[in-house]
Regions:
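Short beta-strand and adjacent tight-turn residues that come in two discontinuous sequence segments
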Residues: 19, 47, 192
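Histidine-acidic metal/acid-base catalytic patches
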Residues: 41, 101-117, 121-218
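Catalytic-core regions built around general acid/base machinery
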Residues: 4-11, 67-75, 132, 177, ...
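N-terminal pre-domain/capping segments
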Residues: 1-44, 138-140, 211-218
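Active-site acidic/histidine proton-transfer and metal-coordination neighborhood
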Residues: 15, 23-114, 204
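Active-site beta-loop-alpha junctions enriched in small/polar residues
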Residues: 1, 21-24, 50-52, 87-89, ...
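Aromatic- and glycine-enriched glycan-recognition loops and surfaces
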Residues: 1, 63, 174-175
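Conserved dinucleotide-binding and phosphotransfer motif residues
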Residues: 12, 78, 185
């Protein structure tokens, strides 16, 4: 919109870790995207997945990996690095042996493409987030973190509870092991997310609880 984000970031005393964009914008004008990232003082541009895209189609995944390599090379020429941010769609099988994320890991070039790993979404998708983080190794440049569990008080109508995002340390994810892995590979930043299901309907309260956990465990 019309907000002056440069001024707002400076006024709040914040640093910009990464700039998010879509692959189409990057393919149209990599220099413009790189210039915007550099204007905020960050070296990372992140693609947050594809919309209206079939992650279960093997040919489409091979094509996506090639497009990411090309876009990453264009950014690298401008002094900026490309990261791919997962959700749960990348866990779809493209054949009997491989998932979409396998294709991305195996066919993207570490010179041009690395990863911002979201452990919540792979856990939500039923995957072993720690195993994937170990497989990524130093290609995981940023780590996206929140917890997963259920917030309910009193009796439940059924024995099956809906799970959702939670404050760090209040859910059921093995955050200690995930944290140890992230720190062992030297991630550049840990990005705390709180996107809904807040304590007392307050995102500030939820973020404070999670921030206290981070301060204690990092």
């Amino acid at each position: 919109g019309n907000l002056d984000w440069h001024a707002l970031v400076k006024e709040a005393g914040l640093q910009v870790v990464s700039l998010h964009t879509d692959l189409g914008s990057l393919e149209r004008d990599a220099k413009a995207v790189a210039d915007e990232a550099k204007s905020f003082g960050t070296k990372y541009v992140v693609i947050t997945g594809m919309y209206r895209f079939d992650y279960g189609d093997e040919a489409s995944m091979h094509d996506l990996a090639a497009r990411l390599n090309k876009a990453g090379a264009a950014l690298k020429a401008e002094g900026v690095e490309l990261l791919y941010h997962n959700h749960n769609c990348e866990l779809r099988h493209v054949n009997a042996e491989k998932r979409a994320y396998d294709i991305l890991l195996e066919e993207t070039d570490p010179q041009f493409v690395n990863f911002e790993f979201d452990s919540y979404w792979f856990t939500e998708g039923g995957a072993n987030a720690l195993a994937w983080m170990q497989r990524l190794g130093t290609r995981m440049k940023l780590w996206h973190i929140n917890d997963r569990g259920t917030r309910i008080s009193g009796s439940a109508v059924t024995p099956i509870l809906k799970t959702d995002s939670m404050e760090l340390g209040t859910g059921n994810m093995d955050l200690d092991s995930l944290m140890a892995q992230a720190l062992s590979v030297g991630v550049d930043a840990v990005i705390l997310e709180s996107h809904r299901n807040w304590v007392d309907n307050s995102p500030i309260k939820s973020l404070q609880i999670s921030a206290e956990y981070l301060e204690k465990h990092m």
